[in-house]
């Protein structure tokens, strides 16, 4: 019987499952190397942790690792129901809150090694977390994609730690009771982007679609479709970072000015940015809550030991 120790949290409604122990040791000098080792040689552990019968499509996993840089608190590898994620904003906030719950870190600044580079997070005395994300930028403005059943859809392509297609004009109500229509539109758009060869830099696949609408209590409300056809319950940290990059590129948000981003559930992140050459450095503040501590058991006699 194999055992995997976990602690679960949610950030603005979006869950994170932090794996503390039980996964195989991963070789590699960088977090990208370790992610590749997990993906290529031990992917069944991701499936066992996140897929049914132990998990669900909406779960995001975070594997706690020893850091690869001397001044980092830890390393982390993010993954979901279909594969691996370079960076995860809500997951980093959940990671920090979970480590604090376990007594492993105190309020203050902490560096985290990720597969796309180091990020910094500040745990505040009130329990909120400010993430200093990887540099973000808009790659392409007003790209057009033909989406079957919806016609021409216009959006910006931006990097915020993952690749996003950001759509302001879509004709849909961005409300929780309209998730089915939002999901169908977003998935169709994501598929059309791939089929028509519309990508991020260096041919990178755009694996997130972000839709926007007005919100009475925030600067904007979004709906984010993630890889694996699961929508983000939070305002999405990397998605908010991509939005900040587009706002900065359009001259609509000044350096240091706050942007309040609401998600589909009504939860909110507060963001701002600093300029770094051709990029911006996003800062995202949110809060996570611990929901469970558990030991997952993997019985190799179980036909669904490694997920369904």
Swiss-Prot record:
Gene3D superfamilies according to UniProt: Diaminopimelate Epimerase, Chain A, domain 1
Reactions catalysed: trans-4-hydroxy-L-proline = cis-4-hydroxy-D-proline
Keyword tags: Isomerase
EC number: 5.1.1.8
Recorded GO MF terms: 4-hydroxyproline epimerase activity
Positions annotated as active site in the UniProt record: 88, 236
Residues at which substrate binds: 89-90, 208, 232, 237-238
Disulfide feature: none
Pfam families from the UniProt entry: Pro_racemase
Free-text function comment from the UniProt entry: Catalyzes the epimerization of trans-4-hydroxy-L-proline (t4LHyp) to cis-4-hydroxy-D-proline (c4DHyp). Is likely involved in a degradation pathway that converts t4LHyp to alpha-ketoglutarate. Can also catalyze the epimerization of trans-3-hydroxy-L-proline (t3LHyp) to cis-3-hydroxy-D-proline (c3DHyp), albeit with 19-fold lower efficiency. Displays no proline racemase activity.
Homology family: Belongs to the proline racemase family.
Protein name according to UniProt: 4-hydroxyproline 2-epimerase
Species name: Chromobacterium violaceum (strain ATCC 12472 / DSM 30191 / JCM 1249 / CCUG 213 / NBRC 12614 / NCIMB 9131 / NCTC 9757 / MK)
Phylogenetic placement of the source organism: Bacteria, Pseudomonadati, Pseudomonadota, Betaproteobacteria, Neisseriales
